[in-house]
């Protein structure tokens, strides 16, 4: 009956007499934080051959993300796999999952920017599983509804000078019928891609290594007149919105 209780004796002396009262104290229930480091909810499958640099990049990215914010303990676990991706220029991918298969992230072991790539793909994961509902990405819902928690962040992204440069070039490519360029422009302007690139840049503010990875992609895409990232001053209001969103969730 008292298997989880501990007997205690209270002794009181009064008027030359001694009174003893027996009572029981229950064990303190173990407490579990509602918010945990993101790395504690990730199952990393490191690569084997020729994967040392990518493995280190993934580990560094998770350590950096842990320094920036937490995630709810109830957030589903995400497998992260360091693999060979047979697509030139592709550093990683996020699979949103189905009823039959859970979500996962793949990071290319030969791309050279694994830390930045992991931050980008983890941004997709959070957009989908933390901020999204019913399988949707929160970034899309935030663009559609002013009441969504990502609404102000998404407005800041599309009002930025970086986004305007992409839109301006996209219109030129429409006029000139540059179809391959148009496809890339549409890709960059998709809400979930805007969110993931911005999330990676926000995280990279805590790590010079990650910032090199993120801005390397920026320099490459600038050559095609579609800059993927934001200049420092242009990004400042966006960073503040990320701070606000995660703070409102109690994750910072």
Feature map (PLM): residue ranges:
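Active-site-flanking segments in enzyme catalytic domains
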Residues: 4-13, 19-252
